[in-house]
Amino acid sequence: MAECRPWLVLWVGCCGCLCLALGELLNDGLLAVGMGTGDAARQEEAALPLGDTVSEHMLRLYDKYRSGGGRAKESLRYRQALPDGNTVRSFRAMNGDEHKKCHYMFNLTSLTSSENILSATLHYYLGDLLNSSHRCPHSLFCTQHGHAKPEFTLYLTLWSFNALQNPTHVISNFLINVSASQRDHPLWQWKDITQAVRKAKEYGEAVLGFNLTIEYPNHRSIDILGLKPYILVYANDSAISEPDSVVSSLHGPHTPLALKPNRKTEKAEQRKKRSTEILLPLQNNELPGAEYQYSVDEEGWEERKPYKNLQGRQNEKDKNKKKLRKGSRQKSQTLQFDEQTLKKARRKQWNEPRNCARRYLKVDFADIGWSEWIISPKSFDAYYCSGACQFPMPKSLKPSNHATIQSIVRAVGVVPGIPEPCCVPEKMSSLSILFLDENKNVVLKVYPNMTVESCACR
């Protein structure tokens, strides 16, 4: 027994190493595409449909992009399919058309001309086939229990066509042999279809048809109709650095970015609204009181008038007293720029740093009406730059040579009307945003210059 003890310790150690290696594979997501990693991924899964493999896969990619390139921990096979870029688009499979003889269809019209396709992958599910077993028809392929693992050949065919045409171009044809030794492979398989997607975009045929057929050794062929496949396209968008790119891509497909006025019907126009009463003090530079003396009729705004009462008719003396009280009340509602108010404002300004500096600003997408289609993040720290760049400017403000000369000329006063240099962002960082496009497909984009890191005088 003592002689077997070292071998027992060695066997336990090997088992422990194997378990650690298996756990590392699970963390990398090699055994299941839909498994998320990290607390951030689990927090965002609540915003995605349950069992949605496409969204779960995109959420994992978002978590890797946000963490600053988690691809170094991935296997070589995934690193080859994840080239550097700023855009990842997912395309869900739609049910095919019998007339077009396609099991599934992909609508790739969301791809823009500014997006240079770097890579594209087709993901399809074979879990039920890999996990199934059947009575072995030939003893040569049987195990000791009389069962055999499935051995078959996959035929993947991709067509490209317009929405109103039959399949016109067979852009890809794949033949994949699945042997018994591949049973323990991932349930979701993927295939590189970069050239196929590029050809479809080149032909101007942004609709792909996809067929998946399986053939067993006895030459029996069946069509696979299980979990729907999906396509991931990795691209580099050259227009993402252009002005207002975040508005055109994030907000453009939905509704125009503008204040939505209240659409009044004829009946609503005749009804008095409190919201219009609240706007008057803003126009007249008056402080809103507990009660409003404004009213709206069908013709528009009426002039200010005293409150109505149910008392008897007053004499002239009472009317004069009432006018005095009314005047004092009106005077108290008007903004007074007296010495006390100005001192309070100056004291508030003195408490804030006057020189150019980075100030805190948190942007919540719900406040600007974008939370409906932005999956993550719900908010982010944007910051902003504010403050004076007066002469002499300290080195901490990192003024440019031009800003230094401009501040000197302004201080000397030789040339009138020269403004002081501006406090602007010096360094900015990017932000990864996961959102839904106009076709309800999940898109990941990395937008540059979204968060201010430091400020300077320019």
Swiss-Prot record:
Q: Cross-referenced Gene3D superfamilies, in alphabetical order?
A: 2.60.120.970, Cystine-knot cytokines
Q: Which GO terms describe its molecular function?
A: cytokine activity; growth factor activity; morphogen activity
Propeptide at: 24-348
Could you tell me the Gene Ontology terms of the biological process aspect for this record? anatomical structure morphogenesis; osteoblast differentiation
- GO cellular component terms attached to this protein's record: extracellular space
Subunit organization:
Homodimer. Can form heterodimers with ADMP, BMP-2-I and/or BMP-2-II, and DERRIERE.
Family, according to the entry, reads as follows: Belongs to the TGF-beta family.
Stated name of the protein: Bone morphogenetic protein 3
The protein's organism comes out as: Xenopus laevis
This chain is encoded by the gene named bmp3
